[in-house]
Amino acid sequence: DYYMEDKTKYTLEEAKERDATYSTRLHVKARLINRETGEIKEQEIYLGDFPLMTESGTFVINGAERVVVSQLVRSPGCYYADEFDTKTGKRTYTSTIMPLRGAWLEYETDGNDIFYVRVDRTRKIPVTTLLRAIGLVTDDQIRALFGEEAMIEATIQKDPIKTGEEALIEIYKKLRPGELPTVDAARNLFSGLFFDNRRYDLAKVGRFKFNQKLGLAERIKNQVSATTIVDNETGEVFVNAGEKISEEVAEAIQNAGINIVDIKYLDRTIRIIGNGTVNIHKVLPNVDLSSLHFKENVNYEVLKNIIDNTEESQLVSTIKQRYEELVPKTITTEDILASINYLLNLSHGLNKSDD
């Protein structure tokens, strides 16, 4: 229980003149219970002075009139925006890949259709440099993954970096200017920046939002497939070329471990790349996973590795042991690729901006 005194130490005008706070005394009733004897002692305690709001909705703090402004902080996730560039007459696109703790990735495009990234808020570099650093080393590997993308092609032509080691060194120079880079130091820094649980944390809400936005099913449902999509394990045809992908089929495609789908949109073929996650309950419908309380989708490659190398009787215990690999706290390579692809899709009119 508590109460505030009706009388203030200073009136509103006096508080302003004396550089004081317009406030009143706050009292609370405290109770001390002796658990051995059962004795209860109650006492009223003066807790401190509590600022009072004026009739105009302000507070006077140390003689100055202040207002309280709520500060909204975005939760971890992937956020996308676009705007019209009046100089070039084109739309430009930006994105922030934001963890709870750790390095940000910030994407941006310019009027020349060059796709850049800022790693941990440093100076921008071509996004293809980042792609080379995570394993897509050659131009052809990048083209093969993303398909025919004018923005990617323009960025490849702009990027002077052509190997994975050069890419790691370039990122190291941006993060540690003035230090002499080595390939090993650059690789360790990059790996620690994004793939170390101690330095990077999406939190549960971040992982949920990543999977929700970057997952394949949500992005291909109600779209027309450009190719016939077949389950690689069973040979089952999910959808034929030219057919619309229903929500149910989209989820089945994703849970089969298929992570890339080409769709037809406005008379062109557009590639959709997911972040490599699946619903573990759909993949293992006959395994009782209720004790593990899985609510998030899991990394398909890790799950497949467990299934292929574990006796059925040991599945549940192995899945429990490798939970942090299945539901990583860090960003994954698949997340990065999907987040880049999402912005490319946005430039074609697919997906939605957040701002």
Predicted features, each with a name:
Residues 1-355:
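N-terminal non-catalytic structural scaffold regions of very large proteins
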